């Protein structure tokens, strides 16, 4: 049985899936790279999966992501004024994220990824999704550049130019890669294989009261659209539950209060939320751990 893993995008909230993966490694005594056969990521999860499949452990990524977030979501007072508080330019300059990704991934290329990985991005030039498959791409791009394209969240960062592509965050199409990951896995391994799929969300906040609809109320549009894309259950996937998709698990943590995608001060809060969620979902996680180690 082939085991496949996809993780949503969601800025700093990708810390939730990292905590889940940390639990799985502790419970099974095995590394994530050895437990799963195919991986898909978008936006911030492309950082996590690229790290896991090249040179970083889950423990290292838990620390790395905290440090990285403080760097890539930094704004000088000069830039805040220059950008008109994000009204005239992207909320953040891309100087810091570019240098940070170069630092953590160096000269690693798509071909250096040790297991099949699909990173989703979106090309503004052709108005279509682009899947960077580490095992089947005409150009062996540097990994940090592919990640950079997938993390170019509109309004947060400017698009990233990579050859003929003008790339932005693939999460504008979907943050939930369940269907894409399943389809890619069938294409890679063949229809005759049986599959287990684990799909990890990055926290979903559902407002309890109607919100005011003025301009300032829509400043957090990226957070809203991220929640919507993550909570969208792909009907097509449910219709594809053929005999070869033996197990499908979608883990999502409901949030009482929204956590903005760039809130790098929220990690302690996320740990508390995760621990509370784990109390009610430990049985499910343990079941998953037992199945993937059979």
Give the label of every model feature segment.
Residues 2-6, 12-103, 142-147, 196:
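Patatin-like phospholipase
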Residues 4-7, 37-43, 117-121, 196-207, ...:
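Extended hydrophobic secondary-structure segments that form protein cores and membrane-embedded regions
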Residues 9-12, 44-47, 54, 124-126, ...:
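Conserved beta-strand elements of beta-rich interaction domains across eukaryotes
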Residues 17-20, 52-55, 132-135, 178-180, ...:
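Short coil/turn segments at secondary-structure boundaries
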Residues 28-33, 102-117, 186-191, 282:
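Surface-exposed acidic, glycine-flexible loop patches that form ligand/cofactor-binding
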Residues 80, 111-190, 252:
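Active-site gating loop/helix substructures
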Residues 91-115, 210-240:
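Surface cap/lid and interfacial helix-loop subdomains adjacent to catalytic sites
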Residues 158, 162-164, 172-174, 189-195, ...:
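C-terminal helical/tail subdomains of lipid-metabolizing enzymes
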């Amino acid at each position: 049985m082939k085991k496949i893993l996809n993780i949503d995008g969601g800025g700093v909230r990708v810390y939730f899936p990292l905590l889940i993966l940390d639990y799985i490694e502790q419970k099974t005594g095995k590394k994530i790279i050895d437990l799963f056969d195919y991986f898909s990521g978008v936006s911030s999860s492309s950082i996590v999966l690229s790290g896991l499949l090249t040179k970083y452990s889950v423990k290292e990524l838990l620390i790395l992501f905290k440090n990285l977030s403080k760097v890539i979501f930094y704004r000088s007072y000069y830039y805040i004024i220059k950008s008109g508080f994000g009204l005239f330019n992207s909320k953040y300059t891309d100087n810091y994220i570019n240098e940070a990704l170069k630092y953590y991934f160096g000269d690693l290329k798509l071909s250096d990824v040790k297991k099949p990985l699909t990173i989703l991005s979106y090309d503004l030039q052709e108005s279509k999704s682009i899947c960077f498959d580490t095992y089947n791409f005409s150009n062996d791009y540097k990994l940090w550049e592919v990640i950079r394209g997938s993390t170019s969240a509109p309004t947060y960062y400017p698009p990233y130019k990579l050859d003929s592509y003008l790339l932005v965050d693939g999460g504008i199409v979907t943050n939930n890669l369940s269907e894409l990951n399943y389809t890619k896995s069938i294409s890679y391994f063949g229809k005759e294989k049986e599959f287990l799929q684990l799909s990890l969300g990055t926290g979903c906040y559902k407002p309890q009261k109607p919100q005011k609809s003025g301009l300032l109320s829509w400043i957090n549009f990226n957070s809203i659209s991220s929640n919507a894309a993550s909570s969208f259950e792909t009907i097509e996937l449910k219709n594809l539950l053929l005999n070869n998709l033996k197990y499908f698990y979608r883990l999502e943590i409901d949030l009482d209060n929204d956590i903005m995608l760039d809130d790098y001060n929220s990690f302690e809060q996320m740990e508390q939320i995760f621990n509370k969620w784990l109390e009610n979902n430990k049985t499910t996680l343990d079941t998953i751990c037992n199945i993937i180690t059979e």
